[in-house]
Regions:
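S-adenosyl-L-methionine-dependent methyltransferase catalytic core, i.e., the SAM/SAH-binding region
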Residues: 1-46, 51-269
Length: 269
């Protein structure tokens, strides 16, 4: 992003502060936003960065334009989105984001002040509605079978914990399949947090607060997110500054799936 000293940068998915810290270390000023209050409260920035260059806001990046203007933080040099979960959310949040945390509740809320949970969806949606959630948010090939198995299971006992859901998936497809787990958990998390709608709003708001030569950097982790970013690049005078996404070679599967796209204004060539 070519960080400029005293330049303004919005870290729209603050997380554990990695992007913000890198920008601060190069002399930039950061407005960090995160929907998860625990992410902000747990952050410890390096003293050398100086606290005055970092402002943190608990909020939804769907409201990025409003948040930036309320904090008198615009126009900005760049906005950064990293759409993956943080390691803390996966391993320590206790909200059932990971299919490996078998005893955790099926919560999956980024913002625990909201009411909608994965547990509610699994125990109240109809079979056709569950199928729609799974197919639309993950394109899981066994969505219909899994939705049907959930309906059968909950007639006898509500789905409460992660292992209740993974057991349903096992029975539906006849085997243990980590990829199926990942896709179904992804689909529920997206639905609970309205991630696709928020991303569209966040990109739209970002386009309104960047400078004429400003950039929007987005790291996605699956094709549905990436599709939203590519489609957005054809609207509102925005274009992809680099045609092909930047990808990282890594032994870690989640890093291999990451794609970085850089967007900017068409008028700035």
């Amino acid at each position: 992003l070519e960080i400029k000293k005293n330049g303004l940068y919005v870290d729209a998915t603050f997380g554990e502060g990695g992007y913000s810290q890198a920008i601060l270390d190069k002399g930039g000023k950061v407005l960090g936003i995160d929907l998860d209050a625990e992410q902000i409260s747990n952050f410890k920035f390096h003293p050398a960065s100086g606290g005055t260059n970092l402002s943190l806001v608990e909020g939804n990046f769907a409201d990025i334009e409003k948040i930036a203007k309320e904090n008198d933080f615009f126009p900005v040099n760049a906005v950064v989105f990293d759409l993956g979960l943080s390691m803390r959310q996966i391993s320590q949040s206790g909200r059932g984001f990971s299919f490996k945390k078998l005893n955790e509740p099926l919560d999956m809320r980024m913002n625990t002040d909201t009411e909608m949970t994965a547990k509610y969806l699994l125990n109240h949606l109809s079979e056709s509605e569950l199928f729609d959630v799974f197919a639309r948010n993950s394109e899981e090939i066994n969505s219909q079978k899994i939705a049907h198995e959930i309906i059968i299971k909950r007639q006898f006992k509500k789905l409460e914990t992660v292992d209740n859901l993974t057991n349903c998936i096992d029975r539906a497809i006849g085997e243990q399949d980590n990829n199926a787990y990942k896709r179904i958990f992804q689909a529920l998390r997206i639905e609970v947090n309205q991630e696709f709608d928020n991303l569209k709003k966040g990109l739209t708001g970002s386009a309104k607060i960047i400078k004429d030569d400003g950039k929007i950097a987005v790291v996605t982790f699956h094709s549905l997110e990436d599709r939203i970013v590519k489609n957005f690049s054809k609207t509102q005078g925005i274009r992809l500054l680099i045609k092909k996404p930047i990808m990282k070679r890594s032994e870690k599967s989640f890093e291999r799936s990451a794609k970085l796209r850089i967007l900017g204004r068409k008028s700035h060539i």
